[in-house]
């Protein structure tokens, strides 16, 4: 039975390879990035104190931006505002890669001024998710 099961599993793996139907996911659609962003909400933003300032990073969201239409960020209860996303680089092997010309995935604020951050994302299928976190990235008031 073990040999039959092993042979069956090997055939399931080999068939797409032999027919050329196995392709790597590019993570360029909402369907592909939603599951990832759903389980990585704690990483959506990061606040870092550096050089006498708070730096608010959205690097994680930029890394999955090809499945997004928009991100909005609100600081300390302010209405969320649109943060531009760099383009999806469909001509590259890693379309979500952050290239030198894409700009910085952060903004500067006065030191210790960020207490809470509201993050809203809109996927390319027009669905959305939101999250409010404290400066440590821990969810609050959702």
Where are the regions that the model predicts?
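Bacterial N-terminal signal peptides that target proteins for export
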Residues: 1-10
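Bacterial N-terminal signal peptides
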Residues: 9-19
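Boundary at the C-terminal end of the N-terminal hydrophobic targeting segment
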Residues: 22-24
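Short strand-turn-strand beta-turns centered on an Asx-Gly dipeptide
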Residues: 75-81
